[in-house]
Amino acid sequence: IYESTVYPGATEEDCIPVIERLSGLKYNVDFFAGYSPERINPGDKEHRVTTIKKVTSGSTPEIADFVDSLYGSIITAGTYKASSIRVAEAAKVIENTQRDLNIALINELAVIFNKLGIDTEEVLLAAGTKWNFLPFRPGLVGGHCIGVDPYYLAQKAQEVGYHPEIILAGRRLNDSMGKYVATEVVKLM
């Protein structure tokens, strides 16, 4: 059972052929595969491995049931059985891509509001009074996954002939925020 965040197709297109080649075994005959992406947030005391719903999948319907049952015996929040390994891989990579893009949007708004002389936190507090406003805050993208995972999806998209403009624009903006923040801090000194 793979848990790493990868682009859709990585498990079956890249990992499985290596196992077949090195072992001499045949996929879905001699061995099977499952995929269930990790969803933990390092340092988060509330959302722990057992309290976050787990997406599961398997290389056959029977293996999908086995993987789902295995995690279901551990995860108190429950499981969601995806229809395929690729669907589970895609679900995970878009979770992180969506977070990255939401942070990029707020970062861009913070730059604009700064240039307009408007306090971004005040704007976000006011906007947050609407029930469906997503409460993101400007800042640097951290962790081992959010700043990298969108590139996995972007690479796969480009391999199939699509240029993911929004995903890459979000990455460019978030990648530039370190320099922007440093410049603003120096101005305050």
Language model features: what each stretch is:
Residues 2-189:
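Structural/interface elements that position substrates and couple domains in central-metabolism enzymes
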